[in-house]
Amino acid sequence: MAFTHLHVHTEYSLLDGSSKIKELLPRAKELGMDSLAITDHGVMYGVIDFYKKAKEVGIKPILGCEIYVAPGSRFDREQGRGEDRYYHLVLLAENNQGYNCLLYTSDAAD
């Protein structure tokens, strides 16, 4: 049975991702994976490199992003009562329109 990781951080997820795209995709192929997602934290910087390298090694690239969902503005500095004030949400593009929506969402968050 094929297995695909749908929540993967690369070196573009600062302070969280340690996988380098140039090493990640050949290793995934070696492990028998036929597809793999990229879901870096709040950025889409690595998707072009990821896409090209995935195609090069014969893996279907799944482009995505892990975004933060938070009430209010990112400039709010109100402290919660010990609980997190934001949530993580993984978004994956199904097609070119979805990819464009990811780019728009990522850009709008800045």
Task: Cite the ranges covered by each PLM segment.
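Phosphodiester-processing cores and adjacent nucleic acid-binding clamps
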Residues: 1-106
